[in-house]
Amino acid sequence: MKQVLKMSAISTALLTLPMMANADVLASVKPLGFITSSIANGVTDTQVLVPAGASPHDYSLKLSDVQKVKSADLVVWVGEDIDAFLAKPISQIDSKKVINISDIPEIKPLLSKVHHEHYHEGDEHEHSHSHDHKHDHKHEHGHEHHHHDVDENGLSVNWHLWYSPTISQIVAQKVADKLTEQHPDKKELIAKNLADFNRTLTEQSDKIKAQLAPLKDKGFFVFHDAYSYFNEAYGLNQTGYFTINPLVAPGAKTIAHIKEEIEEHRVNCLFAEPQFTPKVIDTLAQSTKVNVGRLDPIGDNVQLGPNSYANFLQATADSYAQCLSK
């Protein structure tokens, strides 16, 4: 009898999956949602797959996530490293419903490559899972990540490309093109949203450059290597980072190396992230008397909608300024 009831419950759950509310536009991570929701404003809904408080670096797909991918009219994802967990379900839907940012030709020359040699010296390390987000009991598959694949020259692409205003404008154009195909009756509104996005981003970028200009010589360390596009766009002087992969805390050799750099350079701040809280940052800050700040590369506190991408960049700028100005 129990077995019959169990099977009945499973059948009911499966039957209700297609009835779940779905967004016409689904972004893999929130920063992409900032871009898409700005262009889709008044046209269709936007949802973000990875929930607030979670990190895409260790996210496991749930059955409900797979259903969202299958039922969305448009899925926007990076296509590499950050959201590699989406590769399987996306391969099962119509490619016309997908924007794979890593495949956009105009973006390839703009990708930032960095050298990670001294962070791969056989150093001991430990996993730094310190964020607590809930998972459904059933997952489509386990973690499937390829953190910063390194080429023969020791260089790897930084896929946190949403921090590049230039790349984000290209993505916004691609989203506008897709939405225009899907909603030809909203062509004028989509064009207006795109124009508003570009204008607002330009205006906000000018303000951010002016805000951060006095801080351009202030050195700092970030928790993981996610901010190079932002730093390049707005002239900040990043001294280094604690780890390439935020799931792996730096080991003793790396910490010793960072401490030396803090002492040799004029480092003003060490930045942690809300998704991860490694003790090493607080420990180093106490021993070196360097300020601790917080950067959120996902923008959990920023609401989706018009101007949300510009607001996200401004929130990052404010976090930098708050710590580096001390």
Model-derived features: positions:
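Gram-negative bacterial Sec-dependent N-terminal signal peptides
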Residues: 1-22
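Extracytoplasmic metal-acquisition and chelation regions
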Residues: 23-326
